[in-house]
Amino acid sequence: VQRPVRPNNTLFIVVAIFIVGIALIINIGAHSAQPEAQEQVQSDDQDEMTDMSGVKQGAGDNSFPITDDVSFAVDSRDVYSNPYDWRNLEWNKYNNLAYEKDGKTLSREGIDVSQHNGEIDWNAVKNEGIDFAMVRVGARAKDADVIIEDSVLEQNLEGAKRNNIAVGAYFYSQATNADEARNEAEFVLSKLSGEELDYPIVFDFEPEKGDRAYTLSTEQRTDIAKAFCSTIKGAGYNSAIYSSSSDLTCLYNLDELAPYGFWLAEYNYKPTADIAFAVWQYTNQGTLKGIDGAVDLNIDLTPALQAGKGDNS
C-alpha cells in the first residue's frame, strides 16, 4: 500500500506569515490615519470657536446674540413712527416678553437695577433668562445740587459681568441746565473709570411737581439731554435717553435726540407711543429669582429695529 504524501509544513508557515504581515500593515495604516482625523476634528472645532469670537456678553439661549456695542440710535426722519408689529410679542419660556418673527427671536430680555433693589443674586438672575442689565451709577438729588453715587454700583457691575450678563448704565438726572448735565456725565465717567459696557449710558430724567427741574421748557430739556449724551459719546460710549411715553412725546424735540436713541417706559400690554424707541420697559412690578421685591423688566428691540424686521406694515 502506498503511503500518503505528508503535507509541506514549510509552505504553510510561509503563507501564514505572509497573511499576518498583510494584516499588520493594514492595521498600522488605519491607526496612523486616526490622529490625522482627530486633528481635523480639532481644527473644525477651532474654526467654529473662531467664528463665534465676535459674540460679546452672552444672551439667553433663545435671545439675539450681542456681537457689538448696542446702540439705540435711529434716523431722525423715522423717529415719530412705530416700526414694530406688536402681534410679534410673545411670552417666552421664562415668562418674559420676546419679539418673535419668522421663527426667530429678535429681542433680548433685561432689567434695570439700583441700590433700591438690594443685594442681587446674579447667577439666579441669569438663570431667569436675563440677557442684559442697566445699572444705576448715581443720581442728583431732587431738591438740592448734590450728586450721589449708587451704593451698590461696583457690586452690580461685577456680579452681572461675572454671570455673562451684558451691562449698560444710567444716571438719574435733575440737571437744570447744560452745564449741570455735563457735570453729571463727567461724574458717571469718573465712576465707571473706563469700564467696558455693552449697552449705552442713559440719561434718565423723570420730572415730578416740586422737583428743581420741573418747570423747564422743551428746548431746555432737549439741550440738557444733548449735553449729557454728547459728553458720554465723546468718551467713547453710546448714550441714550430714558423717559415715559408721555414725557418723551411732550418734553423733548426727539428729532434732535435721534442720534442717541430712546428707552421707553410704558406699563401696558403693548406700547402706544408712535416713537422709534429701542428698549421698552414694560413693567416695574416684575419678579425674578435672585431679586427681593419688584424689579423693572425690559425688552431690547434693537435686533428688530436695526434689521428692519420690526416693520409694522
Which residues does each PLM region occupy?
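Surface-exposed substrate-engagement region within the catalytic domains
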Residues: 191-201, 205-312
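Gram-positive cell-envelope targeting signals
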Residues: 1-46
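Functionally critical loop-and-helix segments that line ligand-binding/catalytic clefts
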Residues: 47-110, 255-313
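Polar/charged alpha-helical tracts
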Residues: 32-35, 39, 123, 302-307
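Short low-complexity stretches enriched in small and charged residues
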Residues: 62-68, 81-94, 122-127, 156-158, ...
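Short, flexible, glycine/charge-rich loop motifs used to bind or transfer phosphoryl groups or to couple energy/partner
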Residues: 101, 123, 250-253
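Solvent-exposed, charged interface segments at domain starts and junctions
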Residues: 29, 33-62, 89-92, 178-214, ...
